[in-house]
């Protein structure tokens, strides 16, 4: 270790000198950042868990990764569900042109009775065990994902997807609904959206989320691309 970040090295030696794991991040909620927001905008609850990607390649192999690319070892917990969503599902049209996809969202953990979500500290403590490879089968069964985006794998690797967010979300919603009909457990949920027409409406939802003990909200443009940046 020498105290030099990957970002600094890439600035000196070139953008891709060291590979970095793609991740789209949010900016702080303030009026300056809202200058880029187009109304009606989309508001979602900011989830309080562990950021993750569930990746399925064109051969149907499934992998779960953290926001910095570390493998989250869940012993195939999401495999059947994700394959049913994307890979040659009997409930969907033949996906001959499928080249892989990435679900972007947050991992959360249910309590032992699977009746409520654990707080961030407790839940992420269990999920960190999955990163280390020490999570138990019983704990793994209680892991869920709240998903807010779907990106084609090729675009994810390239760092940009020009398909508008609302279109990406619509395709994800269509495929997920078909999968729910054949799944005993909804291991992956789609994060609900609320349209807003101005800053005041977004701020109201933000304050309501805080009052409920949530971390906050995320405000998005419906036509926004996915990009590997904040």
Where are these regions (language model features)?
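Charged, flexible boundary elements
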Residues: 15-45
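A short linear-motif detector with a strong N-terminal bias
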Residues: 33, 123-127, 195-198, 229
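Amphipathic alpha-helical
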Residues: 4-25, 189-230
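Covalent nucleotidyltransferase
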Residues: 36-185
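Alpha-helix initiation/capping motif
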Residues: 5, 21-26, 30-33, 75, ...
């Amino acid at each position: 270790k020498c105290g030099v970040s990957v970002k600094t090295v890439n600035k000196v030696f070139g953008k891709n000198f060291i590979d970095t794991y793609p991740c789209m991040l949010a900016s702080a909620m303030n009026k300056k950042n809202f200058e880029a927001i187009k109304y009606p905008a989309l508001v979602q609850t900011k989830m309080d868990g562990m950021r993750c990607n569930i990746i399925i390649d064109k051969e149907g192999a499934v992998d779960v990764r953290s926001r910095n690319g570390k493998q989250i070892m869940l012993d195939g917990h999401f495999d059947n569900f994700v394959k049913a969503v994307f890979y040659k599902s009997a409930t969907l049209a033949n996906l001959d042109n499928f080249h892989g996809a990435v679900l972007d969202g947050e991992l959360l953990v249910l309590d032992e009775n699977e009746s409520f979500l654990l707080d961030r500290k407790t839940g992420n403590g269990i999920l960190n065990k999955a990163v280390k490879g020490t999570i138990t089968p019983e704990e793994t069964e209680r892991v869920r994902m709240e998903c807010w985006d779907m990106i084609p794998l090729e675009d994810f690797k390239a760092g940009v997807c020009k398909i508008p967010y609302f279109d990406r979300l619509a395709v994800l919603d269509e495929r997920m609904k078909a999968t729910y009909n054949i799944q005993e457990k909804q291991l992956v949920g789609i994060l609900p959206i609320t349209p807003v027409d101005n800053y005041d409406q977004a701020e109201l939802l933000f304050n309501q989320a805080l009052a409920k003990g949530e971390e906050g909200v995320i405000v998005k443009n419906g036509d926004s691309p996915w990009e590997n940046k904040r």
